[in-house]
Curated annotation (Swiss-Prot):
Known function: Catalyzes the isomerization between 2-isopropylmalate and 3-isopropylmalate, via the formation of 2-isopropylmaleate.
Source organism per UniProt: Pseudomonas fluorescens (strain ATCC BAA-477 / NRRL B-23932 / Pf-5)
Listed Pfam families: Aconitase
Enzyme category, top tier: lyase
Protein name: 3-isopropylmalate dehydratase large subunit
Pathways involved: Amino-acid biosynthesis; L-leucine biosynthesis; L-leucine from 3-methyl-2-oxobutanoate: step 2/4
Length: 472
């Protein structure tokens, strides 16, 4: 019998029923809830006279709409936007009504859903994990089958603890070799997207493997899996190993005592078999990857920091040529312009991609002893959770950022998306550690450039993009 991929094993172990139409019913182990995609789901339960099927499989926190400034200490009433305030209050009310564990806005455990799940040990190897957010793929870094779902599916999972889904194809992205000094997980995943495009992973679950992936920390792997959706794949996976086990051990939701020993033994099988067959294989040489910067309005529009913006006149494909022309116009850039000549207005270090303690440490190394350039209007650092914030402060990272001229904020999704007060003005260029650079993503007319935390910090102190390796 042919070997199985990691994705195959996870799928098969959660398959409840295969349906005649090609879809299947799978069991969901963990459901993470936030304020934006859950109100209608809870109301649907209420109207149908149902209750959540398994209370302890759910955890919740507000993140998308919460302000990151100190005023939020005043509670929900401090949220200025009426819709945002209502969504956060509704999440609190729904979780209180049904007894669902929620880390409310001013709880130290509050944070971005894809930070607090792993941080609490609520994400474990071998699990199925869903959330009403497309970057749920983040949790695949633990050898878990994780992906985003829509609001109607949120209701379905709440009511039944199951989900109707179709099995995906298998893609292997193998990154072998040693990363050059100063090159990070964010650079790997941007390079992958640049290679295969934003549709490259459509219909696939991507397993990231190879020596360069194994060398990454668990937090680095989360960054990789987080952006699998930007490569077109709803699911990103990294096989569980000793790093995974060490990260999870002792966390609040992790198994204890004898159950822990049994779990660790079971997790050893969460790898693709040596003879497993993948539908698509993509290979990258880690040694060839440089610090990356997105220049356009799609994550696939990405280049190494030492390259120039493309010239549409040199593009033979008419569709691609038109997209380059449109992106250049929106971004206010010129053909053949050097990436290092792009002048910046704001810098954002945060998001579910890059707001964990290792990300903040990497940025602080660059910020230490330097000052934010006078041409930068604002540079903000937004920890991914209250616990990340507390850890960073215990290490003195907040002081490094503040002394350099950065703003040190409360946890939340912040400037990743224009659903809270942190946003760009039209025409502003932002070096951002987030995951999407679509038109208007960070604010109407805002121009987003995706980079690693270290590259963002380097841009902040330089006023433009520079090769971070020159500052280390």
């Amino acid at each position: 019998m042919a070997g199985k991929t990691l994705y195959d094993k996870l799928w098969d172990s959660h398959l409840v029923k295969q349906r005649d139409d090609g879809s299947a019913l799978i069991y969901i182990d963990r459901h993470i809830i936030h304020e934006v995609t859950s109100p209608q789901a809870f109301e649907g339960l209420r109207l149908a006279g149902r209750k959540p099927w398994r209370i302890d499989a759910n955890i919740a926190t507000p993140d998308h709409n919460v302000p990151t400034t100190p005023e939020r200490k005043g509670g929900i009433e401090a949220i200025a936007d009426q819709v945002s305030r209502l969504q956060v209050q509704t999440l609190d009310d729904n979780c209180d009504e049904y007894g669902i564990v929620e880390f409310k806005m001013n709880d130290v455990r509050q944070g971005i859903v894809h930070v607090i799940g792993p941080e609490q040990g609520a994400t474990l190897p071998g699990m199925t994990v869903v959330c009403g957010d497309s970057h749920t793929s983040t949790h695949g870094a633990f050898g878990a089958l994780a992906h985003g779902i829509g609001t109607s599916e949120v209701e379905h999972v709440l009511a039944t603890q199951c989900l109707v889904a179709k099995k995906m194809k298998n893609m292997l992205v193998r990154v072998e070799g040693t990363l050059p000094f100063g090159v990070t997980a964010k650079d790997i995943v941007l390079a992958v997207i640049g290679k295969i495009g934003t549709a490259g992973g459509n219909g696939h679950a991507i397993e990231f493997a190879g020596s360069a992936i194994r060398e990454l920390s668990v937090e680095g792997r989360m960054t990789i899996c987080n952006m699998s959706i930007e490569a077109g794949a709803r699911v990103g996976l990294v096989a569980a190993d000793e790093k995974t086990v060490a990260y999870v051990k002792g966390r609040p939701f992790a198994p204890k005592d004898a159950e822990w020993d049994l779990a660790v033994e079971a997790w050893k099988d969460l790898v693709s078999d040596a003879d497993a067959k993948f539908d698509t294989v993509v290979e990258l040489d880690a040694a060839q990857i440089k610090p990356q910067v997105s220049w356009g309005t799609s994550p696939e529009m990405v280049l190494a920091v030492d390259q120039n913006v493309p010239d549409p006149a040199k593009e033979m494909d008419l569709v691609k040529r038109d997209s380059i022309v449109r992106a250049l116009k929106y971004m206010g850039l010129s053909a053949n312009q050097a990436i290092t000549d792009i002048q910046l207005d704001r810098v954002f270090i945060g998001s579910c991609t890059n707001s964990r303690i290792e990300d903040l440490r990497a940025a602080a190394v660059i910020a230490k002893g330097r000052k934010v350039a006078s041409t930068i209007k604002q540079a903000i650092v937004v920890p991914g959770s209250g616990l990340v914030k507390a850890q960073a402060e215990s290490e003195g990272l907040d002081k490094i950022f503040l002394e350099a001229g950065f703003e040190w904020r409360e946890p939340g999704c912040s400037m990743c998306l224009a659903m809270n007060p942190d946003r760009l003005e039209s025409g502003e260029h932002c070096a951002s550690t987030s995951n999407r650079n679509f038109e208007g993503r960070q604010g109407a007319g805002g121009r987003t450039h995706l980079v690693s935390p270290a590259m963002a910090a380097a841009a902040a102190v330089s006023g433009r993009f520079v090769d971070v390796r020159e500052l280390i």
